[in-house]
């Protein structure tokens, strides 16, 4: 069975011409939502619906405005609010050393000084840097900015991330 990875969520419609607003959950939003990109649509219960080919896409604030081929009116896309767009594993490109996909990071164990502190549960994109959410037992989630002084090493094969928690991050 083919594997798919989430690249965004359709959060609303845009205008009357069948465009949708997609909240991206990928570092490669410009590539994923560019003309010709093929994505898969899944409903809110993670059931595959159909493949979609991007006709156009443009960033707007914190989301992308995307038009898919074959959808010409708001009525064609309104039912897809809350649906997920994913990319097939076979359509992912190989990355350079030191680069990784979100799905390779989420679920990784996080260590500081070889002591397990939690697991990465989510990656946020609030602005200049991604923020990795670390779920910890008995403590509130830890938010770590993806910057060199904090994220020391990422081993996607071992699902391990080594960090140095700077003063003020764990108050």
UniProtKB/Swiss-Prot annotation:
Domain PRC barrel: 97-169
GO MF entries: ribosome binding
UniProt record, GO biological process: ribosomal small subunit biogenesis; rRNA processing
Keywords, sorted A to Z: Chaperone, Cytoplasm, Ribosome biogenesis, rRNA processing
Segment forming the signal sequence: none
The keyword Membrane belongs to this UniProt entry's keyword annotation: no
Cystine bridges: none
Gene3D superfamilies, A to Z: PRC-barrel domain (2.30.30.240), RimM (2.40.30.60)
Subcellular compartments: Cytoplasm
GO CC terms: cytoplasm; ribosome
Cytoplasm found in the keyword field: yes
InterPro entries: PRC-brl_dom, PRC_barrel-like_sf, RimM, RimM_N, RimM_N_sf, Transl_B-barrel_sf
Its biological purpose: An accessory protein needed during the final step in the assembly of 30S ribosomal subunit, possibly for assembly of the head region. Essential for efficient processing of 16S rRNA. May be needed both before and after RbfA during the maturation of 16S rRNA. It has affinity for free ribosomal 30S subunits but not for 70S ribosomes.
Oligomeric form and interacting partners: Binds ribosomal protein uS19.
NCBIfam families reported in the protein's UniProt record: 16S_RimM
Domain notes: The PRC barrel domain binds ribosomal protein uS19.
Family membership: Belongs to the RimM family.
Protein's name according to its UniProt entry: Ribosome maturation factor RimM
The encoding gene: rimM
